[in-house]
Each structure stands twice: as structure tokens, then as C-alpha cells.
Amino acid sequence: MNYQKILIRYGELVLKKKNRSLFISILKQNIQKILDTKVEDEFDRMFVEYKDEFLDKLKFIPGISSFSPVKVCEKKLENIQQEVLEETQKNTNEFTKTFKIISRRSDKNFELNSLEMNNYFGSLILKNFELKVDVKKPDLNINIEVGRHHAFVFCKIYYSIGGLPVSSSGKSLHLLSGGIDSPVAAIELMKRGIKVEFLAFVTPPHTDEKTVNKLMMLKDVFNKFQHDSKIHLVNYTKIMNYISLISDQSYKIALMRRSFYRIADKIAKRKKIMAISNGENLGQVASQTIESMICISSQTNLLIFRPLLAWNKVDIINLGQKYKTYQISTIPASESCELFAPEKPVIKPTISKAEELEKELEKIFEYEDELVESVLSQK
């Protein structure tokens, strides 16, 4: 018999006693939107219809700790017995020598308690298979759960990314680049329940279609973690060329990033988003020193999330490979910062010097306001 449903287990939601029902409701909505299917909930479990494609998609939904394809049957011993035998047969091979029965019941009126179920179905397996019991390190775990309406039998458990459901912790406007760090940082925020909206600065014709294509490919990946990801593309060419006119060229990147933050600050506040986020990693490049971060982030009073601040690069790469963003980030394409960077960028910029140079750019704030309005007019 084929599997009828997929049983879904919550992540940290079981610890959130006070707001548990709200978190579960948000998770249920997220699963429905990403899978485009009906979600049933029962006690501390959720169920969706079984489809092979769902097994991959459920691995990336924040708030889910694990899930299992399950056989569903009536809550009668003879029915459960048949499913246990079939599921065991399906999951044993020449290397399977030991087993363990794991029983659980939310229906306390069922005729056997959990210990009695373990003994009953353990005896059944011993009679029908050449297997031995091993409760510490079995080759095969046979799970039996008795719910309010049905019983469920399964052997396989797939693990998801855990965390909290997206939208349970607010929103952030994320400064997205085509590099390795920024996409990983965004997904780490999603895992903590943040709904992430994206702001990406492009500079045509200096950045080509490959750059935009990379961003759209990243959007497809983000949609595995959160439904309906929005990426706002900002044509920054005019301002980038304008900043190139300053007298101290070493400050070009610092002034550009200060400008990014002013634009992000205004957009976030107009959209009632309470935080700005990025993929900054301390000391990795000139714009990611403490002095640079102070100089740049002074342009907003919003909370700034830097989830990768103290990470090792190899750990970021490993996670990017797991999330399928690394393969996209490493596609060759032109990046604004690379094209714009001076030979020797300042690594310890000061706010006073940056403000002095910005006085040379009389129209920069006007140009930034134009970009803000263009983004807000996007659907």
C-alpha cells in the first residue's frame, strides 16, 4: 500500500507555550502557500496529502523540525497490524538485523497504552521477521502513532531546518547582492521567523543581464523558504556615477553604502518594516571593518541584522551549498561594488569626513528620493 499522508512535526514551536497557537497558525498558512495544498492539524502534528515532490519542499520550510511519509488506517489492532507488517517489509533488506518499536498515542481511550503497544507489535515483528530487538541502536525504527481519528505507521523520518515560521518575528528589508554571503544571511533570518523583503542595487549597463538573472534565480530559492519573495531592483547608475565625482576617491564605497542605507531606511519606514539586514561579515572586505560599519550604519536608526557577522567563510559556503544559493552566487556576473571600487578604499572611514564629501554632491539626496519613490511605486 502506498503512503497516504505526510506527518509534519513542529520545531521550536513546542517551546512557545504562550503564543503556541499563533505560531502554529502561521506555520500552517506557510505550508499551505508553499505546497499549494490543504493542511490538517491534530494535537501537535500536521498532515498533508502524500506527494513525492512535497518531500523535498518540506525540508526548507522554517518551523518544521521533521516529517514522515505515513500509512493511515483505522484505530483497530488488526488494521494497524497489517500496516506494520507491510511497512516493515518495505523497509528491511539484507543489512537490517535489529529493530525497535516506538509507540505513541494521543487517544488515551485506545485499548493499549504505549508500553503495551511496544510489546504487542514487537512480538508481531519477532514472529514474522528474522530480526532482533535493539532499543539503543536499531537498524530500523518502526513508529506507530494513534491519533484522535486514525492510526499512523511509518519508518522514515526526514529532517527539516527547524527554527520559527516565517512572519512570526516581523519583517526585514534585506540588502541583496549576487555574492555568497547575502543570500545565506537572508535565509538565516527566515529561519528565525523573519519575513524578508529584498532591495538590490543594479547599475546598467555596467551590470548586465546576468546579474539580474542571478537575482531572479535567488528569488526562486528564497520562495522555497518563504512564499512570494519580493525583490525590488534599484537602478543606481546615476548616483554611482555622481559619487565618482568626489575629491577623495578612497571614500567611494563608503559613500555608496551610506547612500544604500539612506534609501533602505526611507523605503523600510514607508513600508512599516522595522529592520534592515545584510550579509556583512566582520573584516572580510574594506567596507566591513568596525569603523566602516559605524560610518555606514549611521544613516539609519532602524535595527540592523547582520546574521553572518562572526561566521567563518567556509561555514557560509557550506550553508550556501546546502541551501542551493552558492551555486547561483558563483555564476560569473558584474557586481556594482567591484566595478566601482577604488584602488585603495579607505578601511577606517569617519562620519565627519563622509559628511564633508557628501557636501560636494548637492543633488545626492534628491536623486535618492527619486529612487525611493520608484521602488515604492513598484507592485
Swiss-Prot record:
Its main location: cytoplasm. ATP binds at L175, L176, R257, G279, Q288. Residues 52-157 form the THUMP domain. CDD domains: PPase_ThiI (cd01712), THUMP_ThiI (cd11716). Gene3D superfamilies: 3.30.2130.30, HUPs. It holds the Pfam family ThiI_fer. It is found in: Cytoplasm. Its EC number is 2.8.1.4. Pathway: Cofactor biosynthesis; thiamine diphosphate biosynthesis. GO terms for biological process: thiamine biosynthetic process; thiamine diphosphate biosynthetic process; thiazole biosynthetic process; tRNA 4-thiouridine biosynthesis. Transmembrane segments: none annotated. The keyword Transmembrane does not apply. GO terms for molecular function: ATP binding; CCA tRNA nucleotidyltransferase activity; tRNA binding; tRNA-uracil-4 sulfurtransferase activity. It catalyses: [ThiI sulfur-carrier protein]-S-sulfanyl-L-cysteine + a uridine in tRNA + 2 reduced [2Fe-2S]-[ferredoxin] + ATP + H(+) = [ThiI sulfur-carrier protein]-L-cysteine + a 4-thiouridine in tRNA + 2 oxidized [2Fe-2S]-[ferredoxin] + AMP + diphosphate; [ThiS sulfur-carrier protein]-C-terminal Gly-Gly-AMP + S-sulfanyl-L-cysteinyl-[cysteine desulfurase] + AH2 = [ThiS sulfur-carrier protein]-C-terminal-Gly-aminoethanethioate + L-cysteinyl-[cysteine desulfurase] + A + AMP + 2 H(+). Keywords: ATP-binding, Cytoplasm, Nucleotide-binding, RNA-binding, Thiamine biosynthesis, Transferase, tRNA-binding. GO terms for cellular component: cytosol. Catalyzes the ATP-dependent transfer of a sulfur to tRNA to produce 4-thiouridine in position 8 of tRNAs, which functions as a near-UV photosensor. Also catalyzes the transfer of sulfur to the sulfur carrier protein ThiS, forming ThiS-thiocarboxylate. This is a step in the synthesis of thiazole, in the thiamine biosynthesis pathway. The sulfur is donated as persulfide by IscS. Belongs to the ThiI family. This is Probable tRNA sulfurtransferase. It comes from Mycoplasmopsis pulmonis (strain UAB CTIP). The gene is thiI.
